[in-house]
């Protein structure tokens, strides 16, 4: 080898090395494929080229990108223009390798094919190429087709270059042995870079599918959560996109990289993963007396005993008090039972007078199993006296504690560096701007923008949800009125709420997910006009104290509730 050829070879390999480093740093799949072809064309000064990728499922070669300089053609890759050519079968209909096409031959044989003139070969079918040339007044002559082999010696694609050109005259020439050697080295490095990227993408898809499976299982665990875990990511991404697109205001500098978008999506899908530890009988508690069953039926049986006793006394006394008194007693029992049934639903705020009536009814005595006992147990009375909703304070703490479990579960996972904020994003959607949320009592300044976005998404989805058996979904205007009050009261970030309204995210979501009859007019001006009072934040040590105080209260209570089912306390020792 003469000195000039040696220098060219060394220079070419050095270029391959530099290109290989650049390829290994490229994170975008389409850009990587495009760069592989562009660099290969440059190394050989080729007029055009194609990258095919193997579709293992269909056993075909699929067109990934096509470039041709003299025809000014660019399809696939990052161009946004699709390649409307069908995939090429790697095997014939009888299962034998398809050796008629040069690209599929290379994919099957794992050997490079260097053709001086496509019109002069007989062992490959170039009829399609010739027809293309006629239509486009082009002349395809020299072809260099190389397999792209990964570390496992598996073909993941094929690189094909067309019409090498003299760098001085521009005339079409053959691909020389040196050019072939250099491009083979490039194809090898490119295949490894591409394979690594494809493996990362496959791992990401697997992780996303697994996470979505967990979210679907949580939604399926209880009809009371419906499709919440599936829809919160939708609202989260819509509002985040609006923040990234903002060109003025508080979010004009806000943006996310591809990795940060992935991190946010993972967090949104996992935001309620702690609910896997929440007892179903607490999460699905639709009436005040419901546990594994609704204990109102047991109370009804006790009232039947009282009715029986009243009628027996009437018979035993010979009717001395008269039928009217019996009717009065039975009517009073019926009224008290109906009152307890209404109280059990928890649909309205319970007044102190109604709570007192529950206690008086509960204090009555009943004789069962040879024992004299109160009509209602202390636990019955406590539950029936719940002022709002159906949960006791202890049960509410257990429900709220799903955030503790979410944070603990996620913080225990060995997330890579680009996913390290998943616990923070997912664990903050019940926090409020004024520090009155749970479980950590964070303030606005303690929370990232994505965490605050997720808080809005969680509230909005919960209020508009139509698939909850215990409530009707609210109209769009009702939902936004509630969220406007939450903005005023420092529960939701006011700047993000304004963006939520101005960008129209709330309406686009509603038009997609809500029945048309509930998508009504919203007074946007009134919401935007709300200006919350200035917050006065306590010292950081006081803010941290809320988290420290929450755990000691939470763990014994969740232990008591779960203990009834002989379930170990999550995170307990």
Regions found by a protein language model. Give the residues of each.
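Signal-transmission/dimerization alpha-helices at domain junctions
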Residues: 1-3, 108-112, 158-161, 181-203, ...
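Divalent-cation-assisted or electrostatically stabilized phosphate/pyrophosphate-binding catalytic cores
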Residues: 174-178, 214, 284-309, 367, ...
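Regulatory sensory and allosteric helical modules in signal-transduction proteins
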Residues: 71-139, 367, 383-386, 392-393, ...
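GAF sensory/regulatory domain recognition
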Residues: 50-97, 120-121, 159, 289-302, ...
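Regulatory loop-to-helix N-cap segments in sensory/regulatory domains
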Residues: 1-7, 126, 139, 154-156, ...
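Signal-transmission linkers at sensory-effector interfaces
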Residues: 1-35, 42-43, 65, 199-213, ...
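Helix-loop-beta substructure at the N-terminus of cytosolic sensory domains
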Residues: 25-77, 95-102, 109, 225-229, ...
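A short, aliphatic-rich beta-strand micro-motif
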Residues: 141-157
């Amino acid at each position: 080898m003469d000195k000039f050829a040696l220098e060219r070879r060394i220079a070419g390999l050095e270029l391959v090395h530099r290109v290989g480093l650049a390829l290994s740093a490229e994170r975008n799949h389409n850009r990587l494929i495009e760069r592989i072809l562009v660099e290969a064309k440059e190394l050989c000064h080729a007029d055009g080229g194609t990258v095919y990728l193997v579709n293992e499922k269909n056993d075909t070669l699929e067109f990934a990108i096509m470039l041709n300089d003299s025809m000014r053609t660019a399809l696939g890759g990052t161009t946004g223009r699709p390649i409307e050519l069908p995939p090429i079968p790697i095997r014939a209909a009888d299962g034998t390798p398809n050796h008629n096409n040069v690209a599929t031959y290379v994919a099957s044989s794992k050997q490079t094919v260097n053709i001086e003139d496509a019109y002069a070969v007989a062992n490959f079918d170039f009829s399609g190429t010739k027809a293309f040339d006629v239509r486009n007044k082009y002349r395809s002559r020299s072809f260099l087709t190389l397999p792209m082999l990964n570390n496992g010696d598996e073909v993941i694609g094929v690189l094909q270059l067309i019409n090498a050109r003299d760098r001085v005259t521009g005339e079409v020439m053959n691909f020389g042995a040196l050019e072939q050697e250099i491009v083979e080295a490039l194809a090898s490095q490119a295949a490894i870079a591409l394979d690594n990227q494809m493996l990362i993408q496959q791992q990401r898809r697997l992780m996303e599918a697994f996470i979505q499976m967990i979210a679907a299982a949580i939604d399926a665990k209880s009809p009371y959560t419906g499709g919440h875990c599936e829809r919160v990511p939708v609202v989260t991404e819509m509002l985040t996109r609006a923040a990234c697109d903002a060109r003025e205001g508080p979010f004009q500098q806000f943006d996310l990289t591809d990795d940060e978008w992935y991190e946010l999506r993972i967090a949104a899908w996992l935001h309620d993963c702690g609910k896997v530890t929440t007892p179903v009988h607490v999460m699905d508690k639709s009436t005040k007396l419901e546990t594994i069953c609704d204990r109102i039926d047991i109370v009804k049986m006790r009232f039947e005993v009282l009715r029986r006793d009243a009628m027996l006394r009437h018979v035993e006394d010979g009717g001395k008090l008269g039928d009217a008194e019996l009717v009065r007693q039975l009517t009073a029992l019926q009224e008290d039972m109906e009152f307890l049934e209404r109280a059990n639903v928890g649909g309205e705020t319970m007044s102190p007078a109604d709570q007192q009536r529950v206690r008086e009814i509960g204090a009555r005595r009943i004789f069962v199993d040879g024992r004299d006992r109160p009509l209602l147990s202390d636990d019955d009375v406590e539950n029936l006296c719940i002022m709002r909703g159906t949960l006791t304070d202890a049960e509410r703490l257990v429900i709220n504690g799903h955030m503790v479990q979410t944070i603990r579960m996620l913080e225990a996972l060995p997330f890579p560096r680009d996913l390290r904020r998943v616990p923070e994003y997912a664990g903050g959607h019940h926090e409020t701007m004024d520090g009155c949320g749970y479980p950590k009592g964070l303030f606005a300044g303690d929370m990232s923008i994505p965490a605050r976005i997720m808080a809005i998404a969680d509230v909005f989805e919960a209020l508009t949800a139509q698939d909850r058996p215990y409530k009707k979904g609210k109209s769009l205007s009702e939902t936004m009125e509630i969220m406007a009050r939450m903005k005023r009261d420092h529960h939701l970030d006011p700047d993000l709420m304004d963006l939520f309204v101005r960008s129209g995210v709330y309406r686009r979501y509603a038009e997609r997910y809500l029945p048309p009859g509930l998508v009504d007019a919203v007074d946007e001006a009134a919401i935007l006009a709300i200006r919350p009072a200035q917050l006065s934040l306590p010292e950081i040590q006081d803010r941290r104290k809320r988290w420290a105080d929450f755990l000691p209260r939470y763990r014994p209570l969740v232990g008591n509730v779960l203990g009834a089912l002989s379930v170990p306390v999550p995170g307990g020792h």
